[in-house]
């Protein structure tokens, strides 16, 4: 049978999602925990690979197993073997044709950025940081140039393995919440798929515009250039969260977890 799991994790201590020889990745820790609980080797496929330092609120994976166990057993049993910064949120049987990556019709990410004269301490790794004030209207105006279908080569990492740089951005929302002497900014992105470092490179551009280094129209020029050197430097992975994939309702999978509610 095929099982889907919803996984949340803090990426700060890991070398990204994808398995490596070092064993210091989220995939390695999850597969080890699943294999120990199932007492047999288990390999998983994920909805979207995350970089080192990037967090996930609802990564979705699937795996095949001959074992018949209650979904609650997969959750509690696997969590018993996972480190404290990785947790299975839910488990659900799915049809054999379901694929965590191929069945996803969209993917969602959020960036949380602290605007403050002082760098974060307690929130280190959980938020990005800028010390110069940001202009929300300018960033929202600039973001309009990213909506719809575009060739996103200007935001593509050199090591990106995607077959095509053409993606469709369906949603960008920028909001803020004020605190004493600071502001938390939340940037949400939804697209059919993302290129390697695409969001981090877009964030570098949006923040440059928000800080007054470029006008909003500059982002349209960056898109049109289709060259990585036309864009701003890649922003830090701190504060980047994979919110999860979007599936058709017929799959009946959860669309969010409680962890969404504590993001600024």
Swiss-Prot record:
<dbReference type="InterPro" id="IPR020095">
    <property type="entry name" value="PsdUridine_synth_TruA_C"/>
</dbReference>
<comment type="function">
    <text>Formation of pseudouridine at positions 38, 39 and 40 in the anticodon stem and loop of transfer RNAs.</text>
</comment>
<dbReference type="InterPro" id="IPR020103">
    <property type="entry name" value="PsdUridine_synth_cat_dom_sf"/>
</dbReference>
<feature type="active site" description="Nucleophile">
    <location>
        <position position="51"/>
    </location>
</feature>
<comment type="similarity">
    <text>Belongs to the tRNA pseudouridine synthase TruA family.</text>
</comment>
<keyword id="KW-0819">tRNA processing</keyword>
<dbReference type="GO" id="GO:0003723">
    <property type="term" value="F:RNA binding"/>
</dbReference>
<dbReference type="GO" id="GO:0160147">
    <property type="term" value="F:tRNA pseudouridine(38-40) synthase activity"/>
</dbReference>
<dbReference type="InterPro" id="IPR001406">
    <property type="entry name" value="PsdUridine_synth_TruA"/>
</dbReference>
<feature type="binding site">
    <location>
        <position position="109"/>
    </location>
    <ligand>
        <name>substrate</name>
    </ligand>
</feature>
<dbReference type="GO" id="GO:0031119">
    <property type="term" value="P:tRNA pseudouridine synthesis"/>
</dbReference>
<dbReference type="Pfam" id="PF01416">
    <property type="entry name" value="PseudoU_synth_1"/>
</dbReference>
<protein>
    <recommendedName>
        <fullName>tRNA pseudouridine synthase A</fullName>
        <ecNumber>5.4.99.12</ecNumber>
    </recommendedName>
</protein>
<dbReference type="InterPro" id="IPR020094">
    <property type="entry name" value="TruA/RsuA/RluB/E/F_N"/>
</dbReference>
<comment type="subunit">
    <text>Homodimer.</text>
</comment>
<keyword id="KW-0413">Isomerase</keyword>
<dbReference type="InterPro" id="IPR020097">
    <property type="entry name" value="PsdUridine_synth_TruA_a/b_dom"/>
</dbReference>
